[in-house]
Design a protein with these regions (language model features):
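HIT superfamily nucleotide-processing domains
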Residues: 1-141
Length: 141
């Protein structure tokens, strides 16, 4: 297991590094990555530091995907996307993370398309996504 104190995502969770957070609950945080494949690209992470997706216990695994599903609908609406593409690879940061990427075609989910996030574009988009997520129906237990 990687050192959580050295993990960039753990630093974001702790508030020691800035991030454009669009969703936070007791167990997860979703934010814009520094490089995005398409506008609206989000990264969803569990607050529990775990390196590999399949090392999460069953409850944490299910909660992660339930949170991804709750985010995907409003994100798709805001971005007027046909789909929300999902990618999990885990090599760039040793902390479980799910990429939620608005796409309109298969080729839209291509990491080679990643580019630096433009603050002029990101700030208004951040606000629109946060509002849409806040208006979405709360999770059912």
């Amino acid at each position: 297991m990687a050192d959580p104190n050295a993990c960039v995502f753990c630093q974001i969770i702790a508030g020691r590094l800035p991030a454009r957070i669009v969703h936070e609950d007791a167990d997860h945080v979703a934010f814009f990555p520094l490089e995005h494949i398409n506008p609206g690209h989000l990264v969803l992470i569990p607050k529990q530091h775990t390196d590999y997706l399949f090392d999460l216990d069953a409850a944490a695994y299910q909660a992660l995907w339930a949170t991804a599903a709750r985010i995907a609908g409003p994100l798709r609406d805001v971005m007027a996307a046909k789909r929300i593409g999902v990618a999990v690879e885990g090599f760039s940061v040793p902390h479980v993370h799910v990429h939620l990427v608005p796409i309109n075609a298969f080729d839209d989910l291509n990491p080679a398309r990643a580019q630096a996030l433009d603050p002029a574009q990101a700030d208004p988009l951040h606000a629109r996504i946060r509002v849409a997520l806040a208006r979405a129906a709360p999770a059912r237990d």
